Amino acid sequence: MSKNTRRPGETVSERQVDPLATEDRFLTWVVGMSDWMKGNRDFGLIVAFLVMLGGAALVYYMDFKRDQINQAASRLESIHQSITISALEDAKAQLSTFVERFSGTPQAEEATVLLGRLHMEDEDFLVAISVLESAGLSMGTATGIQANSLLARAYEAQGRWSDAEEQHISVASASDLDFEVRESLEAAARIRITQRDFSGAIELYQEILEALADDDPRRGIYTSKMAEVAGSVE
């Protein structure tokens, strides 16, 4: 009988499927996987070690940042105390060192504002500008807005009218506090008057009035200022 001749009653599946061969293939796969796992055991240990090392590094970093912030808060409090006893020059030196050491922390931003303010009080306007510009604090935080408002006043004190006006208006746009917006717009209006931009000053006073309630007593103050400036235009 030819090997391709099918016996009566024998189906194709019955003739082709070999249960023993299928089992052999499965056992071969299991043995192969077992051998691979044994051969790559060191690799698996390395991966596990790296995962553990990464987790430990993350925990260390979080602890480090927490300790840094705690140290910064404690150190800044100590500097505040030195200011209250009038050791101002020493306080400035300590604040400068503090800003460098704790750069990137909220306390460093607060120290920058404090250092800039001390230089402003001593009329060291150029130094104040250098400190505040170097910090480059964003107006996305309350401390950043304070720093930029202080920088605007330092520009103004140095007669940098264009920079001061632009900075005051930027602070007014960024702040959510009514008094900061009002003070910044009023400062910008004052600069425009100095530069004889009377119509520009009136525009800023008008913007202040629009933000005040109809019964706000301060409306009379700004209305009078507008009238005074309008008289200068004539």
Language model region names:
Residues 101-108, 137-145, 172-181, 209-222:
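Short solvent-exposed coil/turn linkers within tandem alpha-helical repeat scaffolds
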Residues 88-89, 125, 161, 198:
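TPR-repeat structural position
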Residues 2-49:
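N-terminal positive-inside, membrane-proximal cytosolic segments immediately preceding the first
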